[in-house]
Every structure is written in C-alpha cells, then in structure tokens.
C-alpha cells in the first residue's frame, strides 16, 4: 500500500481486506495466549524461524501484527515491534545495541526517564553514555569512543521541544559506522519521518500521540532496514550465529528486519515486556485519527505560543516556531506543517509562582503524561526531571519557574481563557 497517502495508510495498513475468519472490517482483538500447529514439522519450523508465524502470545499476536505493520508503514520502515510501553521500546533498543560493554552518545535534552536510564540504570549493566550538546557536531563527534554503539536523539526534545539536525547527525553517525536511533514520540510520522533523514531505528512511546487519548500504554520500535549490522563487528548478537536458535544469524534469516527480529526473538522472548492485544487494539483506534488530531494540536499550539509570547507575566517561551528561538531554522526545515505541542514557558517569578499557576488551571490536567487529546500541564523540575541534579537541570534548560504544557484539542478559546485565569490567580 506504499502508493497511498498517509491518511489512507493510517486506516488500512495491516488489514487491507476484511478479517479472513469473520469478514470483520474492524481489526479483531485476538485474545489468545498460544496457537495450534498443523503438525510437529510445522511446530519445528516455527520454532526454528524457518516459518515466520505465530508461536506464543509473548512473541506475536495478530492484533499486534496489524499495529506493527501500520506504524512501520507510516514511518517508512521495513518492520516494527510493539511492546508494553515506550520505556520498554527504548530499553530493548539500547540493550540490543549496547550489550557487552557498549557506549552511547546521547542528546542532553531528552525525556527525564530516558536520561535516567542512560545515566544511572544501564551503567549498572556495563553500558555507559556521554551526553552532548546535540547542536555542536564537533562535540558529538569528539564523544564517540571505540565502544560506541549508537547516537541517540529525539526529534523534539523533552520538555523544551529543541530540534536536532537529523540529516547532519545521521551523516556523522554513518561516517563512524554507527546507527542513529531517533525517538519520534513528539514528532510522530505525520509531522516528520526520521528514516527519510537518515535514521536507522525509530522508537515511540505509543502511549502519547499515536494512541492519543491517555488510555493505553505501549511502545514501538521501527527498523529502517538499511543499516549494515555485520560491517563493523560491533553487533555480533544480530549478525553472528546465535546459539539459542541453533546458529541462526538474524541478518541472514531476517534480512532488512534483522534488528527488530533479534529483539523479538531474544530480548522479548526472555524478558517478556509484551503488549496485550487489547492495548494494541486501542492504539490502532488512536492511529486511525492521528493526522486529524495532529492538525488540531498544531493549530492550537500556534495560538497558545502567540498568546504566551506577548503575555506580561511570561519571562520566556521555549518553542522553536518563534523567530528568535535558536532552533527556528531547523523547525522550518523539519516541521513545515507545525508541531511541538509539548513545550515549556517560564513564568515571571520562581517555583512558588509556577506551582500557583498550575494549581489554578481548570481544563489543563496536572499529570505525568503528554500528547493527550486533553490539555496537560506539569512542573518538570519537581516531577518528570526531578532525578536530575541542579546542574543537569540547568543543562537541559529547566528552571524553577519552568512550566511544561501539552496542548490538546479543546476549543482554543477555552484553552486561552483557562491560561489567563491561572495568570490572574498568580498576580
């Protein structure tokens, strides 16, 4: 279906014809733990990866399969793997690349959970990192070590929506024989497709814009299909014969889909962060309206940014659509249709004023999620990024008076009125 437009793909990929068993047009929920084999030879072929069909619900499910095919198509990848959460998608990706003493070069201004994973959790397993100013390519290149396994970035940084130059970073990564991993949770494939700019692996917290309604946890790993896993010798688990599958090389067995096949067959098999068919179904419902929702998110965001930029109680708005933002040129290059509905601003005053503003909002919900159809708010320094030191917070541009907004799809007049009411409460 690659000839179809995005809006058509988000509705049809993975179920181009009605369900063969029932003729249902909607994707069925296949609530089963396991699958019947035709005979012993059939079972052996499945377990030996000679026949790429269903074995057990921890590895594959037909509802999950539709979700994977759909997101892979929307991102322009060759294959995808859906897992239980965005954190699981990121963790599996980094474990697959970094095992046996690997090192990552990572964007400094990323989601606090990803920062904590790289800086504190993975080092306990022998995997290290260097955080860099992603806009300084000389600093990025200088951070690459002999054991570096990948460069890790986000299309829109969390929480300030800063934008890396994906094209340039991809060239740099490939110059050193490294894959570029891009978290496209905030960008979404509707606004930007990192694989088209040189990314090799794309990860998502599907909980956010893909699902879109704050109901369902899920994560997605998309394989771009073009990276040579055998060339450098740094990825033997993917390229070399695997003893737990009778010497199968995932590069030879799965071809362009080697990366996600390895994670499914080894890491998911052995650690089990499996997405449920019910969660996969709910995420598919969200994806069907992704383009429609993103257009409204972007439209509302433009108006909120303009409102805040000229508000007398606002010290600064951190949004790349503003002409004086340091990433404005990159925003125009990579996001011609808008975006960045998760961003921060700094209220005049300090933490007390920020908290009072947040506590007086009515439509905006104070919670840890983002990218919901509903508008959301949080104080990053005391919540999502509270594990960071004072210096780390400063490096990420998070101050005591920083407030993160996630602009929803409510009527813009109601959103602006709610913000103004909270400002008046702070006076």
Predicted stretch roles:
Residues 156, 185-187, 322, 348, ...:
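Active-site beta-loop-alpha junctions enriched in small/polar residues
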Residues 2, 18, 80-310:
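Conserved PLP-enzyme active-site core in the AAT-like
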Residues 2-61, 69-70, 403:
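N-terminal "arm"/small-domain region of PLP-dependent enzymes with the aminotransferase-like
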Residues 39-91, 113-120:
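Conserved N-terminal alpha-helix of the aminotransferase class I/II PLP-enzyme fold
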Residues 78, 101, 119, 128, ...:
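PLP-dependent enzyme catalytic core of the Aspartate aminotransferase-like
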Residues 271-274, 278-280, 285, 289, ...:
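Conserved small-domain helix->loop->beta segment predominantly found in fold-type I
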Residues 151, 219-221, 317, 343, ...:
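Well-ordered beta-strand positions enriched in small/hydrophobic/aromatic, beta-favoring residues
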Residues 222, 344-346, 406-408:
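Short hydrophobic/aromatic beta-strand micro-patches
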